């Protein structure tokens, strides 16, 4: 008589949708993702009419729109090369990412992401080479950018199942409660967005540091050249830190207290 072998049933892994539910209830614009990917689902996925209003318990994850929620993120696709490239530009990428809402991925080689509130003239920038492909993205402003939320389940290029989780104590929230970028990095990112020649120079230095041939930007800012004026939001940090009275005092004006 043959012995019956009982194989224990292993339940399929499920996405953790806790954060998606919390952020939806905060009023943030979320988007549905294609099953087991980090790609948005459907046509016009970023339209207001298609924002998520209920969490599907069978979903494998949700994304958060960056521009409409006034947030942005740093996305190192190749962690080791991104660290090396940013070091050549004078920045400690690990410290900068620690300042934001940081997430980590189980995908090998991923540097995770770090999210911040967005102000000024920040926009989407990319550092890539012919040899390495995309190494680092600075993601902001474009209506076509979304970040997968912690808890997502997705397959990498090999079919391996991966997930993302928080990497520290900070959590996604409404923009006003999100961390600000460190001042020096904010100023540098903004200059890259408004001064094309500066940005191309930074791309070349980044690429040289990792032994690659850089694929350089062909336009910068909204005009493609250095801005000759202070655009909306550029003085935001100054205004927050400086009172009207102190400015008047500095220039010898009188005012009613």
What are these regions (language model features)?
Residues 1-257:
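Conserved phosphate/metal-binding and DNA-contacting active-site motifs used
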């Amino acid at each position: 008589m043959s012995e019956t072998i009982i194989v224990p049933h292993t339940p399929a892994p499920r996405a953790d949708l806790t954060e998606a539910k919390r952020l939806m209830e905060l009023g943030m614009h979320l988007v549905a993702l294609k099953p087991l990917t980090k790609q948005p689902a459907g046509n016009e996925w970023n339209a207001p009419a298609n924002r998520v209003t209920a969490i599907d318990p069978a979903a494998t994850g949700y994304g958060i729109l960056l521009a409409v929620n006034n947030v942005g993120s740093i996305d190192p696709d190749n962690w080791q090369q991104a660290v090396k490239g940013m070091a050549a530009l004078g920045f400690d990428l690990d410290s900068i990412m620690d300042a934001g809402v940081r997430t980590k991925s189980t995908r090998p080689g991923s540097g995770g992401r770090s999210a911040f509130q967005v102000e000024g003239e920040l926009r989407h920038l990319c550092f890539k080479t012919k040899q390495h492909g995309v190494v680092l993205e600075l993601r902001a402003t474009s209506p076509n950018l979304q970040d997968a939320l912690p808890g997502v389940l997705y397959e990498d290029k090999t079919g391996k199942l991966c997930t993302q989780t928080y990497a520290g104590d900070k959590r996604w929230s409404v923009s006003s409660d999100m961390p600000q970028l460190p001042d020096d990095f904010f100023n540098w990112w903004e200059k890259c967005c408004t001064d094309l020649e500066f940005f191309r120079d930074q791309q070349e230095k980044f690429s040289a540091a990792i032994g690659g041939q850089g694929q350089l930007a062909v336009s910068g800012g909204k005009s493609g050249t250095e801005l000759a004026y202070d655009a909306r939001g550029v003085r935001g940090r100054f205004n927050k830190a400086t009172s009207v009275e102190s400015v008047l005092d500095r220039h010898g004006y009188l005012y009613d207290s």
